Regions:
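Intrinsically disordered, polar/acidic, low-complexity terminal segments
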Residues: 2-57, 61-63, 67-117, 203-206, ...
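Hydrophobic, aromatic-rich transmembrane alpha-helices
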Residues: 273-299
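Perimembrane helix-loop-helix junctions
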Residues: 185-218
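Membrane-interface alpha helices of multi-pass inner-membrane proteins
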Residues: 164-180, 185-191
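Membrane-interface micro-motifs in multi-pass membrane enzymes
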Residues: 52, 56, 111-157, 177-178, ...
Length: 498
């Protein structure tokens, strides 16, 4: 067994410290919209109803185990977040060593070149699309999927034996059983590593290796889909994610679907990065590449790399029964800025390019600082949103108890509707930060479940009484909680959310 060097331990601890600082806001009890449903259904029903049907077997096993151990939800959620931080730091560590060996003589010497590589890798792991991997109750398993994809890419490039492809397929398939949406980073990293690996200068061989990597990527997804169908068939249920017969329908929707993807992923970045930052960075990278000695080849390689990153993210959407996209599904597209920096470092990886290396370092440092602060702010905004939801939930709880004490009625049913100009993120924020600032009491997916959590009850959902709605809520608009938003009648609470 290879002895672990002291330098490697120090290197990992530095990366772990960075991850702890960035994720510090989430190292406490926090609740995403899905988490309300998770806590409402419990450790066994929720994974059976959601994870297992989607062939997310590892997430299912984790939650089953927590149920067997009868863990408190707070212990489970915080524990999974701690585990996610540890796993993410391993992802940075392994990716840094893998890429660093291709571009640097000594990866332990934190010179300008290595600093660029390390900052770029943290931007890849903590890109705006992958931040949701730290949000949900199963966050550690989602981060594990990323780590397994990175390990698969590392083995693909570094190992020479004949059996490596079987090993990679098994690892990548295991990654799909954690979370399918993150494995698109595998093919993007393989493409990047093939390009920057000086030992792989044969273009035909590189194309062959890329095709093999693509086949492994597709086969792992197919295996996951087959398992999905088998599991649902065994359970007597119908899976709701993917189907081969919807490809033609989704292709016919190509224009509106691509418009939606381009707008949200590449222009707005789901409001998690500044608008247009990815296209702008691609433009800057192209300008810098045109200043290099390898103008033509560099441009071809870079454009191909970007196309792979984009297509790996968006092509699976065309298999979906309900085509749509969320940040967590397109980590590969979000990694474009990080991989662009690494490619630029490769292009100008010689002593004569000192000025260009300085320029790349300044650009990288500016974006690294921004991304770190931005990530902490996004995580903090999620905690602030949780507190707003908690305040409203606890206030409603006391209001219900007061009504019950005064009338003797027992509230068992809830009907809800939104006000005339509702917004699903807190007032005080100019824009919604994806799922991080999604208010529970404006999300039809989890309003009842949030009420159940804060009131410690099991309410029954019922329909809104039109007369009560017209008399009390019609045309009204609030920007904060008000007692006017709640009306009681018998055993039913009618609520109009703002």
């Amino acid at each position: 067994m290879k002895k672990i060097k002291k330098k490697d331990i120090v290197l990992y601890l530095v990366m772990l410290t960075f991850c702890i600082i960035v994720c510090a806001p989430l190292l406490q009890m926090h609740i995403a919209s899905d988490t309300y449903n998770f806590m409402d259904l419990g450790y066994f029903q929720y994974p059976s109803q959601y994870f297992l049907k989607d062939a997310r077997i590892i997430s299912t096993l984790f939650t089953y185990l927590a149920g067997i151990l009868n863990l408190d939800y707070q212990v489970f959620i915080v524990g999974m977040e701690v585990l996610a931080v540890i796993i993410a730091s391993f992802s940075i560590y392994i990716l840094y060593k893998t890429i660093g060996k291709k571009l640097s003589e000594n990866i332990y010497n934190m010179n300008l070149k290595n600093s660029i590589i390390l900052m770029a890798i943290t931007i890849i792991i903590f890109n705006c699309m992958s931040l949701e991997y730290f949000l949900y109750a199963e966050c550690a398993v989602m981060c594990l999927s990323v780590l397994l994809s990175i390990i698969a890419a590392k083995i693909f490039i570094e190992e020479k034996n004949k059996h490596k492809y079987v090993k990679i397929l098994l690892i990548l398939t295991l990654a799909t059983f954690c979370y399918q949406g993150s494995i698109n980073i595998f093919i993007t990293l393989v493409t990047l590593l093939l390009i920057i690996d000086k030992s792989k200068v044969n273009i035909k061989e590189n194309i062959k290796q890329f095709i093999i990597a693509g086949i492994i990527f597709v086969v792992s997804e197919i295996v996951n889909i087959i398992c999905m169908y088998l599991i649902n068939n065994f359970m007597g249920s119908e899976q709701e994610r993917v189907a081969g017969n919807v490809i033609i329908r989704n292709i016919l929707l190509f224009n509106p679907l691509m418009k939606f993807i381009i707008e949200n992923v590449f222009i707005l970045n789901f409001n998690l990065w500044p608008s247009m930052i990815i296209p702008i960075f691609i433009g800057i990278s192209i300008i810098l590449i045109l200043c290099s000695k390898k103008k033509i080849r560099g441009l071809i390689e870079y454009i191909f790399l970007i196309l792979v990153a984009v297509l790996a993210s968006i092509l699976p959407v065309f298999l979906m029964k309900s085509p749509g996209i969320e940040p967590r599904m397109v980590m590969s597209a979000g990694s474009i800025i990080g991989i662009s920096i690494i490619y630029l470092s490769y292009i100008f990886n010689d002593e004569k390019s000192k000025i260009m290396q300085d320029i790349i370092f300044v650009i990288t440092m500016i974006f690294f600082i921004f991304n770190t602060i931005n990530t902490i702010q996004i995580f903090s905004a999620h905690i602030a949103t949780n507190k707003i939801d908690a305040n409203m939930g606890i206030t409603i709880k006391y209001k219900i108890e007061k009504y019950e004490n005064e009338t003797g009625n027992n509230v068992t049913k809830v009907a809800y509707r939104r006000d005339s100009m509702h917004r699903d993120f807190p007032y005080g924020y100019k824009k919604k930060l994806s799922s991080f600032t999604q208010r529970a009491f404006d999300n039809y997916y989890c309003i009842i479940e949030a009420l159940n959590y804060y009131c410690n009850r099991k309410f029954e959902k019922t329909t809104m009484d039109e007369k009560i709605y017209t008399d009390n809520f019609l045309g009204k608009n609030w920007n904060t909680y008000s007692d006017e938003q709640i009306v009681f009648e018998g055993d039913t609470m009618y609520i109009c959310t703002y």
